[in-house]
Design a protein with these regions (language model features):
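Transmembrane helical segments that form the transport core of multi-pass membrane transport proteins
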Residues: 233-321
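Alpha-helical membrane segments and immediately flanking helix-loop junctions
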Residues: 95-100, 107-113, 128-138, 142, ...
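N-terminal alpha-helical transmembrane segments of multi-pass membrane transport
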Residues: 1-75, 85
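Hydrophobic transmembrane alpha-helices of secondary-active transporters
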Residues: 37, 94-120, 253-256, 274-296
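Membrane-embedded hairpin module used as a gating/binding unit in multi-pass transport
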Residues: 188-261
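Structural signature of hydrophobic alpha-helical transmembrane segments
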Residues: 19-30, 91-106, 150-160, 187, ...
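Entry/N-cap segments of selected transmembrane alpha helices
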Residues: 119-140, 292-318, 370, 374
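Alpha-helical transmembrane segments
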Residues: 177-195, 303-313, 337-341
Length: 393
């Protein structure tokens, strides 16, 4: 065989290995979605820490290659390239998503950077965080109505908690086949909190309610801050032990912060560690959304239910504040504009409360009050995930 015969024989094989030979319209759609995520993150600054890794991961996951369907490590045609192919680097990194390793580590970092003072000083705000979980159970009911199984509906419903790590953790247990769509939906709507919530908040409140001034929160002692994660862990996990991986790490991270004797550990948890895990979770979740598995009618339903759950969660938080005010004396009333902060997109939903409040009164700063239900929502979404896991696993 001379050189030209060899070249002609193997040129066709080479072309068959390229992405051009395996490209479909589905891959094009997914690449456009990935580029849109990157655009929104960079140009509009919508959750860039999340959308840049996810968007780039979508690009990685939708570069088509020959033999993508060969996933078993012993298969000689497994090139060990794709996120689903055993033995590939991406598959090893995806292990943390598939088996729920990354979400508790994210919660450890969240705990280490969260100040629960606003919640400790005004404990009734935890009820707002609980009321906002209405979105989870509302979406769960809607998903059942649309024909999803109970386990799938539970995994979809958690999108309403506005907590990406919780959504990944629960879907990895209840509906691993839908995890990519659920995770991308959760993170997408987290990024769109400043767009979704304001119209609902304005619709549900009147001008008098928007001008309510809340009493400044009292100063919380160091002892209270140290006791909170310990008591919080015991109370929540004795009731919902299945939420222990998330709640345990959340409260442990907070104790590292508040004890002040483990500052180096707290700094590591809320700095390098959470940044590394965020990169890995975003990149691998994005890479898992391949055209063949992502572009399905179920994915469309998941995104629709995700939007519905966010709106119901915002509705639940705001309306609960209005109802609670019926039983509170003047001077102790709650501005219902902080009700949306029960949706646990920290601190974005609390910032929305601040921005909308300032539109009506330039001197009425609601951020410090909104952080109470905001951090309560983090706890509430983890508890809700534990409840769903207990009933549906």
């Amino acid at each position: 065989m001379n050189f030209f015969e060899f070249l002609i024989e193997h040129l066709g094989k080479f072309i068959g290995y390229t992405a051009f030979a395996n490209f479909t319209i589905g891959h094009l759609i997914m690449i456009i979605i990935g580029l849109t995520f990157i655009y929104l993150a960079i140009k509009k600054e919508f959750e860039p820490m999340l959308l840049v890794p996810i968007g780039f991961g979508i690009l990685i996951g939708n570069i088509p290659f020959w033999g993508a369907e060969h996933i078993v490590s012993t298969d000689p045609q497994n090139l060990q390239i794709g996120v689903y192919q055993q033995g590939s680097v991406l598959n090893y990194l995806y292990f943390g998503v598939r088996y729920g390793v990354y979400p508790p580590l994210i919660f450890l970092g969240i705990g280490a950077m969260t100040d629960f003072s606003a919640l400790i000083s005004n404990p009734k705000l935890i009820l707002i965080g609980a009321a906002a979980q209405l979105g989870i159970f509302g979406a769960y009911t809607a998903a059942l109505t649309l024909g999803f199984s109970a386990a799938e509906a539970g995994a979809i419903g958690i999108i309403g908690g506005a907590d990406g790590p919780t959504a990944i953790f629960l879907s990895s247990k209840l509906a691993p086949d839908l995890m990519g769509a659920i995770a991308v939906s959760a993170y997408s709507y987290m990024a769109l909190v400043p767009v979704i919530q304001p119209p609902i908040m304005k619709l549900l409140t009147n001008s008098k309610e928007r001008l309510i001034r809340m009493k400044p929160p009292r100063i919380v002692s160091k002892t209270e801050k140290i006791l909170f994660p310990i008591i919080g862990l015991l109370l929540t996990c004795f009731i919902v032990p299945s939420g222990l991986p998330l709640l345990g790490m959340l409260f442990f991270g907070n104790l590292l912060k508040e004890s002040t004797v483990t500052k180096r550990l707290a700094d590591t948890a809320k700095g390098p560690m959470i940044d590394i895990v965020t990169i890995l979770i975003g990149l691998t979740v994005g890479a898992s959304t391949q055209a063949t598995t992502f572009l399905t009618p179920k994915s469309v339903g998941i995104f629709a239910l995700g939007a519905f759950s966010f709106m119901i969660a915002t509705f639940g938080g705001v309306m609960f504040c209005k109802i609670l005010n019926l039983f509170l004396k003047d001077g102790n009333k709650i501005n219902p504009l902080i009700g949306n902060a029960g949706v646990s997109a920290v601190p974005d939903s609390a910032r929305v409360s601040q921005v909308i409040g300032l539109e009506y009164d330039k001197t009425n700063h609601l951020l410090m009050h909104a952080m109470g239900p905001n951090v309560a929502g983090v706890i509430g979404s983890a508890v809700a995930a534990g409840i769903l896991l207990s009933f549906l696993y």
